[in-house]
Amino acid sequence: MKPSIHSLAHQTMQEWVLEQGEKKFRADQIWEWLYRKRVQSFEEMTNLSKDLIAKLNDQFVVNPLKQRIVQESADGTVKYLFELPDGMLIETVLMCQHYGLSVCVTTQVGCNIGCTFCSSGLIKKQRDLNNGEIVAQIMLVQKYFDERGQDERVSHIVVMGIGEPFDNYNNVLNFFRTINDDKGMAIGARHITVSTSGLAHKIRDFADEGVQVNLAVSLHAPNNELRSSIMKINRAFPIEKLFAAIEYYIETTNRRVTFEYIMLNEVNDGVEQALELTELLKNIKKLSYVNLIPYNPVSEHDQYSRSPKERVLAFYDTLKKKGVNCVVRQEHGTDIDAACGQLRSNTMKRDRQKAVAAVNP
């Protein structure tokens, strides 16, 4: 299986063209074709020799993903289901924000974190995505606009799709370098956000990288008992260890951390939990931001339901009165398979039903 050309960082591309007996500037030409002109085949790179094009075709593919399903929401959100070369399925989401086009990318096939409210973990992790497969998601979303003649450009990236990004640490870091490169997509690091469920040791590593990418932490509960009951990762990285890593990150980078908090009716959404959360954040209040997330129900997790608006507002008001910066997240794609992993799991379920029907007509 040939790798995607998008797997190569610019420096690696330079090394590759030199190995082929070409001049270093050929790497710049290839990158311009890929990221500025956004061609879909090597044959479209008209200023390259036939010999170099043949070598590119022999060793790489441009696009490793196949588009299976596209769902468009009335609010402009678009959800994509892509098939990988090995037949595995992943999701990518485009959100039209007031500040530009934001793409939520997937980093793993399946997820081992095991959050009890999330559809992403219904299917266990099969493998990591490589850098090229993550970059290709953005390129295909951009192609969606290019083919419609819309002069719009993907400007923001959130690494919050299926999987735990810090469990695929090196590929995700290489992905950041590729999309941030001025010769490529040139997406500013401060326009990129990566979300972790709480791998404390990787948060420390990320602090030491010195990158300007924003950090978000999926917290979802203010104490160990509750968090362990809905997020099994808390047993490995309890709140004390997690917050020690977060404080290290803030001290090292002086950058704000966003805390994601999904609102589960009568589970974690009471005023009591809001007060616990304010206590948890008291030492880092100035550099913390809480994102309250309305829950998208998942049929396989019917023990949970969405918090009523009055409970969300009471929680929000409690945080604000205690001086915690917070917001209730704007919803996107509520009229399509909105929950993370839902489109993928529903499609796989339908595929299995079709297979059974074919065997037992």
From Swiss-Prot:
The keyword Transcription regulation does not apply. GO terms for cellular component: cytoplasm. [4Fe-4S] cluster binds at residues 111, 115, 118. S-adenosyl-L-methionine binds at residues 163-164, 195, 218-220, 296. Its main location: cytoplasm. It comes from the Bacteria. The keyword Signal does not apply. Binds 1 [4Fe-4S] cluster. The cluster is coordinated with 3 cysteines and an exchangeable S-adenosyl-L-methionine. This is Probable dual-specificity RNA methyltransferase RlmN. It comes from Streptococcus pneumoniae serotype 19F (strain G54).
